């Protein structure tokens, strides 16, 4: 069932299954995305809830090859001290990424605390990166900032941006735009809540393809348990599907902005995500029967 149909709206160039919608406004696309923060994070650490609300939205625009313009927020507040911490986190995120919050809405005296942000960005039409266009034969390239830490109370949130300079953090986002402008990748997705492998699964599902990934090739800090790492939200991480001849150039672009990169696998037409360690191989997702998001790409 198509609950929110976009057919019949010719201005919609990309929607369901993408990190941001792409809206045709003439010589470029306006990118439009939104993210809500899990209630558990708001309860555990409202500061990081506010900061991550900014970060995840900026990442969504970057993943499309775009550059962010501005955000609006919606806050629901029951405790004033929680509100202050959320705002403090958002303020630090605004300063870090250089993207303003220009308005929004507050629900005061609510029965719960919540923060949601929506963002707009822009991208040239020929530089748009989708997550639904990975193709059999593509290399799978992971680029990840492995210089970070886990806050004591956030087991699966790997923080890489708060301790870095504003310039390097913004350059990391700009690196994705460079990949788009140089037409180096067929598809891109920012590593989000399901971790790097889970994010790849979302890309493959939406692209209606499969892949095999060697987990031993995935960039990782030396002192982190591998299972924890693969389940972690990455402060800065992107998954690309690209022609093999472009893989090294993508890795080189990100090496200049404190990110490790590697070819970790290959896209195929199996519609299965298979993991190997060089000895054993197992199927993680079989998209003939497994569903991650259920999203399908927009038909052109």
Task: Report residues per predicted region.
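Short, compositionally biased
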Residues: 152-168
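Glycine-rich anion-binding loops of enzyme active sites
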Residues: 26-32, 37-39, 67-154, 247, ...
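Short amphipathic alpha-helices in soluble, non-transmembrane regions
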Residues: 249-259
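Helix N-cap motif at beta-to-alpha junctions
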Residues: 241-248
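Extreme N-terminal cap/leader segments of soluble proteins
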Residues: 1-42, 64, 73, 84, ...
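Active-site-proximal betaalpha loop/short-helix elements
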Residues: 166-235
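Small-aliphatic-rich amphipathic alpha-helix that forms the alpha element of a beta-alpha
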Residues: 45-72, 85-96, 171-180, 196-202
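Acidic, Ser/Thr/Pro-rich beta/coil linker or hinge segments at domain junctions
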Residues: 257-300
